[in-house]
A protein has these predicted regions:
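Soluble catalytic domains of enzymes that build or remodel membrane lipids, polysaccharides, and related
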Residues: 1-209
Length: 209
């Protein structure tokens, strides 16, 4: 984590987004593990992923808050001229059977778009762990959709399978007027290796129209 923090700070970001899966094991679920996050040079916003649920989502959120991370729980904030919506882990809609893991609560991206996401004058950025429900977010006027979850497949042939499972498996996509980016993540799940994908720290520059 210390190495990741150094690389992030070297990019001199204005704001940092973390789209979940901070932990996959309870053995390192402690403040000492997260201490390097205090050194980040910009505000960081986090939404929880399914792996965080494996070790206890509430515990993960509590620890992250103690090191200064802004944890978003299906809510909207404004920072650095952006309207930022952070969603808890949820399905795309009531018919979504491809979430792969049990979602948190009854909310769906479709229902949240009707209740929470209201396009204003600021660029609208949505953070959600699973890159699903893009059609609802685009219709709601979202400018940028940031997600993770897929690890890009991590290992061949899972890359090929993921490309067919997920609407946005990895990298940059455009859906109507919305751009979506799914990060492969800076770590791994299970075996500490990748074949056909690379770990990443994504740097984006947003420009006004």
């Amino acid at each position: 984590l210390q190495k990741i923090v150094r690389k992030v700070n070297a990019a001199k970001p204005d704001i940092i987004f973390f789209t979940g899966d901070c932990f996959e094991s309870p053995y390192n679920l402690n403040l000492r593990t997260l201490e390097p996050l205090k050194q980040l040079s910009a505000p960081i916003y986090f939404v929880a992923g399914n792996h965080d649920g494996y070790v206890g989502t509430d515990s993960v959120k509590a620890l992250l808050r103690q090191v200064g991370v802004h944890v978003l729980e299906t809510e909207t904030v404004e920072d650095h001229g952006l309207q930022i919506v952070g969603l808890d882990y949820m399905r795309a809609d009531e018919q979504d059977g491809n979430s792969m893991h049990a979602p948190v609560g009854d909310a769906t991206i479709e229902s949240v778009c009707k209740e929470l996401i209201h396009k204003g004058d600021l660029p609208l950025v949505v953070l959600h762990h699973n890159p699903c429900g893009g059609q609802y977010l685009e219709k709601a006027g979202v400018d940028l959709y940031l997600a993770g979850h897929t690890h890009g497949g991590q290992l061949y042939p899972l890359i090929w399978i993921n490309d067919r499972l997920f609407q946005f498996n990895r990298g940059l996509y455009r859906l109507g007027n919305m751009q979506a980016y799914t990060s492969c993540g800076s770590g791994t799940f299970g075996p500490p290796m990748r074949i056909g994908t690379r770990s990443e720290i994504t740097v984006m520059e947003m420009k006004g129209k």
